[in-house]
Structures are given as C-alpha cells and as structure tokens.
Regions:
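Class I S-adenosyl-L-methionine-dependent methyltransferase catalytic core
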Residues: 1-182
Length: 182
C-alpha cells in the first residue's frame, strides 16, 4: 500500500496510518487533494462530520485546512485504533471526537449542525441516500452545508435528496466524488 499523508494545511506532510485489508478503503492522497480543491480548498472554521471515518484522512485533512473540529464515526475496532493514532499525530486531540459505533446509531445521537459532511460508506447508494435523509430530518445540516460523497464511478446518486441537491460531480480514476449543497 502506498504511504498516505495529509496533503495541505496545518498538518500538511504528516504521515497517516492506514488499515491493511478490506475493512476500509482509504481515499488516496491524489483524490483527497482533488476533492478539497473542489470544495475549498481552505476553510474558516466550521464543524465536520465523517460518518464512515476509516483512517480519518478526510476529516483530519479538513481540520488541517481550517475546520474548527471534527466528529469521526467508525464501527470497526481495528480502524478505531488507527484513527486514534492518526488523531494523536495532529497533537490537537481536543479538536476531534471519535464515536465508536455504527453510522446509523451515531445519527440518532448527534446534536448541533455540521458545515461539511463526508460520506464514503461500504454500500454506497442506499446508505448515502438514507444518511442524507436522516441528516436533513434531524436538522443536523447548517445553511451552508457541503456533503461530499465518494463512490465507485458507476454509482448514480439522485439529483436531490431531502433539502440538498448535487452541486458538483467529478470522476477520479475508479472513484466518483459528488458534492451536495442546499
């Protein structure tokens, strides 16, 4: 596996640990960099939610680029250990909250609003639609929300889900990045 690192910002260049195997599919540095160029590339505060955090690369990158804090959700115990190590690497653990549970359970417990949400679930389309509907129903999205979904390039997501619609969509190799906004 290619070594991964934070692409830019405060933590730029720092290495990220990843989990070997099929439990998580880390977003490559190239796709992550392109993804942030689509939506940013830098932020002035805000709250980020990563519902299928894996190694935490996306939310750690977002905080590195100016988000104030991140909530990372991960159910797999081995991935949680990698996540904890990657959060410790930032030396700013207080900016990250790790919820060790299923995404569906976390969605029932979360409070406040989020400005940026990352969705990269294992069963893309059905889970993305369900998760966005729940985020809208529970009023967890800020007015300026950006929801970034990473799927296989062949997955077709709906134009609109709840109160959000597709703003941008781009294919990078075998991955497709879809961004929803209000």
């Amino acid at each position: 596996m290619v070594p991964m690192k934070i692409v830019s910002g405060t933590y730029g260049g720092r290495p990220l640990k990843t989990l070997e195997g099929k439990i998580t599919r880390p977003t490559s540095d190239k796709v992550r960099g392109a993804m942030f160029n689509m939506i940013g590339p830098y932020f002035d505060g805000g709250r980020v939610l990563d519902l299928y955090a894996g190694s935490g690369g996306l939310s750690i990158e977002a905080v590195s680029r100016g988000m104030s804090e991140a909530v990372l959700v991960e159910r797999d115990r081995r991935a949680q250990e990698i996540l904890a190590a990657n959060i410790a690497m930032t030396k700013e653990k207080e900016r990250f909250q790790l919820l060790k549970m299923e995404a569906k359970q976390a969605l029932g417990l979360l409070t406040g609003t989020f400005d940026l949400v990352f969705l990269d679930p294992p069963y893309a389309k059905e889970e993305i639609v369900r998760d966005i509907e729940t985020l809208c129903e529970r009023q967890l999205l800020s007015e300026n929300i950006m929801i970034v979904c990473e799927t296989d390039k062949h997955v077709e997501l709906p134009e609109e889900i709840g109160q959000v619609g597709i703003w941008k969509e781009k294919i990078y190799g075998i991955s497709k990045v879809t961004v929803y906004v209000r």
